[in-house]
Amino acid sequence: MNIDVITLFPDFFTSGLQSGLLGKALANHIATVNLINPRDFALDKHHRVDDIPYGGGVGMVLKPEPIFAAVNSVHRLPSTQVILLTPQGSPLTQTTLQDLSTNYQQLILICGHYEGVDERIRYLADREISLGDFILTCGEIPALALINGVVRLLPGTVGKVESLKAESFEDGLLDYPQYTRPAVFQDWQIPEVLRSGNHQLIAQWRKEQQIQRTQQRRPDLWEKFEERRKQKIEDRKHEQAE
């Protein structure tokens, strides 16, 4: 996969793109990340990329010309998504990451900055994505999160496919509790079922823990999980009736 990032601060990505599984994946050419600075496409000698907002107001707004030129400089593959990182976008979810990693050869990420972007920049984007209902100083943070989440789903990044399938959100539920040695730490003991060797009981316990955690910590996820479960039951009934 090719990932092109339109960013005013390329240095922000230096450490994040070189560390851990993401760094290894890029070194192994599972994905490539190209950083493009819109200042290189500015129209004046001072390389200005922002200006005051029409109508007044605080802060500065990213100008459309450098962003359009930067995006249009990218050689596009047949299946490409242009994504604007903005607090006004749809929340980034595991489902979104799966869609992007599976259905596209190339992502072009536009990192917002300052008070925001000129509204016309939105015409470049196929979709807008947000990390959540909060404000950050820059779009580089959600861009790096998106890159990490997408690349780790690409074949070859994570050693065991089972690791991906067993994670939080993969089945719509939070993950079950994980334990390692020692079996007892400061009077806290691991659940006996995990030492039983009975894989069926362990699987049952883990599923119960997933359900319990999701109900308690993320009732919104549990509600969606239940809706999908009921829909699957209805779909099976219709299939059997045909």
From Swiss-Prot:
Its predominant location is cytoplasm
Any GO BP annotation: tRNA N1-guanine methylation
Which reaction is the catalytic activity of this chain? Answer: guanosine(37) in tRNA + S-adenosyl-L-methionine = N(1)-methylguanosine(37) in tRNA + S-adenosyl-L-homocysteine + H(+)
Task: From the Swiss-Prot or TrEMBL record, state where the protein is found.
Answer: Cytoplasm
Which UniProt keywords are present, listed alphabetically?
Answer: Cytoplasm, Methyltransferase, S-adenosyl-L-methionine, Transferase, tRNA processing
One cellular component term (GO) for this entry is: cytosol
Asked whether the keyword Cytoplasm is assigned, the reply is yes
Entry keyword Transferase: yes
Matching NCBIfam families, A to Z? PRK00026.1, trmD
Similarity-based family: Belongs to the RNA methyltransferase TrmD family.
Q: Which PANTHER family match?
A: TRNA (GUANINE-N(1)-)-METHYLTRANSFERASE
Q: How does it assemble?
A: Homodimer.
- What is the role of this chain? Specifically methylates guanosine-37 in various tRNAs.
The protein's name in its UniProt record: tRNA (guanine-N(1)-)-methyltransferase
